[in-house]
Amino acid sequence: MPYIGPMLICHGDIPIKRGNPRESMAKVINDGKMWISRGASIAIFPEGTRSKDGESHRFKGGAFALAKEAGVEILPVVLDGTTKIFKPKSFFFNWRNVLTVKVLPPISVEHIAETETSVLAQEVHAVMAEALAQVRKQ
């Protein structure tokens, strides 16, 4: 959906350059800390892109590095059904499908501070993958 990117930028989202991970990480952390200092909540898709197959893939470290540097907790949210509503390469929403949202318990500031970023990403991924599996069983 090529119109989503420009719409998100107008909304105040943080665009990243996919070809330069180091620059992207610095931008996420700097801009993210600025928004957090203004009282905003930030939503980050930790895979770095939307899943084209509806499965959970490896998490990148940006969200976790930001939480660690900003000293804030992480509230994991699992989404199921996005690939049915926002089909890849389509310009239209498919409103006839269900999007399930499951909010998980927050990850404490203390746990974030004492856990290495890559380990934290793996832990949160495991918790979210298990929750996604449970949502799909219902």
Q: For the regions a protein language model found, what residue spans apply to each?
A:
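Non-catalytic C-terminal accessory region of glycerolipid acyltransferases
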Residues: 26-138
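Catalytic core of membrane glycerolipid acyltransferases/transacylases, capturing the structured
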Residues: 1-22
